[in-house]
Amino acid sequence: MLDRKFILQNAQLVAENSAKRGVSVDVDAICRLEAERMDALKQAEELNRQANEVSKQIKSAKDNDERQELIAKGRSLREQKDAAGAAQDRLEAEILELQTILPNMTHPDVPEGGEHDANEIGRGKTPVPEMDFQPLDHLQLGEKHDLFDFEGGARVAGSGFYFLRNAAVRLDLALQQFAISHLAGKGFTPVSTPDLALTSVLQGTGFNPRGPETQIYSIENTELNLVATAEIPLGGMLSGQILASEELPLRYCGLSHCFRTEAGAAGRASKGLYRVHQFTKVEMFAFTLPDQSTAMHEEMRELECEIFDALEVPYRVIDTATGDLGGPAYRKYDLEAWMPGRGESGDWGEVTSTSNCTDYQARRLNVRSKSNTQKGTDFVHTLNGTAIATGRAMIAILENHQRADGTINVPEILRPWVGCDVLKCE
């Protein structure tokens, strides 16, 4: 969340930023409630001072009548102090509720608008393939090669769940192995994360586990939720900690299952593996000093490009517009892969995103840094980025590497794990 002092000193700027990002929140109400809270705090402190003074007077009371009168006065003052304290707590809760709705501030170079206003800022090394045959989509290819079982998945867990079969299992594992190996070679520590996280951790990382638009599966009568991304447990892993500035940045790559309700998602472009309720992902996450986060964001974007260049998948790099930024993101880049079977005649589909969240998550999670020469502490910056979401990466590989006879070339980088060069129809 944003620093409250910053909000109060820059109320108009914060309100304008929220409007650009499509978030409706009454910033003036935050300022008004904070003024009331400060008044209640001052009142409580003054009443406490008076009550302490009365306590001293009781000890030197001349007689019992005076003592009883002072005791009654002290009791009244403490009751008033408690009421002022309760008012302060109530106002604090109201402010915090509004404060957590506010999105992060926005990088000045981020384009303003919605999905169609995003800027394309680059392309991958692999060109969009020119196919002299009618390409199949990944579901048709999956049927030919016996790769997916959506009907069986629906019988087990409902629509949006599936079984991977045969070569799809090897391909899924190969993508995980490749991404983790690549990132480990770049200084990232591999981590296998819990699939559950406390509600406080979700809220700290900017995810809303409640409400009609939530993407989170919550476990009834508990404070636990299935994680939508490894960003959640990786961010919470160091919550409440003070990190040594000299050891930053800390780089992690987290392997997790991801669970999402995908409420409201439907349509031809979302079919098959593109939008499901459970998938596997390797996620990059970093804790940095404030002056390191911009460089780390560019590093994560470059790593995503390296991974998809190695997979020989055509993609474009998108600088996401204000209306599509998640609440914690100061700036976000997406990689969109070309998918020949998407839509009516092929289209781009998001396969990765990487966000610089500055101190927005760290402030709520209370992750700070301190150097050997520093008296106080500072909030760190946090960043996250998709290395591989295996389902969508599989779509891009199958559809771009298919051949006219229905066989599928396996990207060279994955062959040691997949165990073959070409997937052939059985």
UniProtKB/Swiss-Prot annotation:
It catalyses: tRNA(Ser) + L-serine + ATP = L-seryl-tRNA(Ser) + AMP + diphosphate + H(+); tRNA(Sec) + L-serine + ATP = L-seryl-tRNA(Sec) + AMP + diphosphate + H(+). L-serine binds at residues 229-231, 283, 386. The keyword Nucleotide-binding applies. One of its GO terms (biological process) is selenocysteine biosynthetic process. InterPro entries: aa-tRNA-synt_IIb (IPR002314), aa-tRNA-synth_II (IPR006195), aa-tRNA-synth_II/BPL/LPL (IPR045864), Ser-tRNA-ligase_type_1 (IPR002317), Ser-tRNA-synth_1_N (IPR015866), SerRS_1_N_sf (IPR042103), SerRS_core (IPR033729), tRNA-bd_arm (IPR010978). GO terms for molecular function: ATP binding; serine-tRNA ligase activity; tRNA binding. Pathway: Aminoacyl-tRNA biosynthesis; selenocysteinyl-tRNA(Sec) biosynthesis; L-seryl-tRNA(Sec) from L-serine and tRNA(Sec): step 1/1. HAMAP family: Ser_tRNA_synth_type1 (MF_00176). This is Serine--tRNA ligase. It comes from Rhodopirellula baltica (strain DSM 10527 / NCIMB 13988 / SH1). The lineage of its organism: Bacteria, Pseudomonadati, Planctomycetota, Planctomycetia, Pirellulales.
